[in-house]
Regions:
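A conserved catalytic-loop motif detector
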Residues: 112-113, 130, 136-139, 148-160
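Active-site SXXK
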Residues: 1-14, 137
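Active-site-proximal alpha-helical segments within enzyme catalytic domains
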Residues: 2, 128-146, 193
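Conserved SxxK-family serine transpeptidase/carboxypeptidase catalytic domain
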Residues: 148-193
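Active-site-adjacent helix/loop patches that line small-molecule binding or acyl-intermediate pockets
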Residues: 10-124, 140
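Electropositive phosphate-/nucleotide-binding environments in soluble metabolic enzymes
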Residues: 49, 92, 128-131, 155
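Cytosolic covalent-transfer regions centered on His/Cys nucleophiles
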Residues: 119-121, 144, 156-159
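Structural beta-strand/beta-sheet cores of well-ordered domains, especially the beta-sheet scaffolds
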Residues: 98-100, 125-127, 161, 191
Length: 193
């Protein structure tokens, strides 16, 4: 999710598309953050599923995002694990509901745009990476977006992503973890990486 957010910012995602970075005690995959009674029409955080699906709307061609991740990881053969993608698409009813809520609140203009963003998000979640590869991508962030002396990511976008991880990277346990392990920026995910 942080890499989706960074990529979206690099592609021109306006900060107002993710209205603010607000930690919440809600689960990462709830659509409650977009309910009419919350008076919010934009996801409040780029690291919950609503925010990540919203960020995925900035991916015009998924191959471009994959090329970005290949560059960061140093693996030119990085790919989507098609069996994981197919399984996720068959069982992601909650994320479909979130994408439709994003359409209903005006984040996406059409149902097709919302479903394309959902597809991009699901494909991104199914990219097969090793711990060494994700570490290499994180090293690029730690070096301020530099690879071999070339600025490949805006430092401002890295700061935004790190701040997002610091405020909600471990979802509803972020506050507890931040208190016990001050300064640790992390993101929990299903892969365990």
């Amino acid at each position: 999710k942080p890499f989706l957010y960074i990529y979206a910012l690099e592609q021109g995602l306006a900060p107002s598309d993710i209205s603010y970075i607000e930690p919440t005690a809600m689960h990462f995959n709830t659509d409650a953050v977009l309910q009419p009674e919350s008076h919010k029409s934009r996801p409040g955080h780029p690291l919950n599923n609503a925010g990540a699906i919203s960020s995925s709307g900035a991916i015009d061609q998924f191959e471009d995002f994959l090329a970005f991740m290949r560059r960061l990881t140093g693996n030119s053969k990085l790919s989507v694990l098609e069996d994981v993608y197919t399984s996720e698409m068959a069982t992601n009813a909650n994320n479909r509901a979130i994408a439709m809520r994003l359409v209903a609140t005006g984040r996406f203009s059409t149902i097709e745009d919302g479903m394309r963003a959902l597809d991009n998000y699901t494909r991104a979640c199914a990219i097969g990476v090793t711990p060494a590869e994700i570490t290499a991508a994180c090293v690029v962030l730690a070096r301020g977006g530099m690879i071999d002396g070339e600025q490949v990511i805006s430092e401002n976008h890295i700061v935004r992503a790190i701040n997002a991880m610091n405020s909600y990277g471990l979802y509803e346990r972020t506050g507890e973890i931040s208190l016990l392990a001050a300064g640790v920026r992390a993101l929990s995910c299903k892969s365990g990486v």
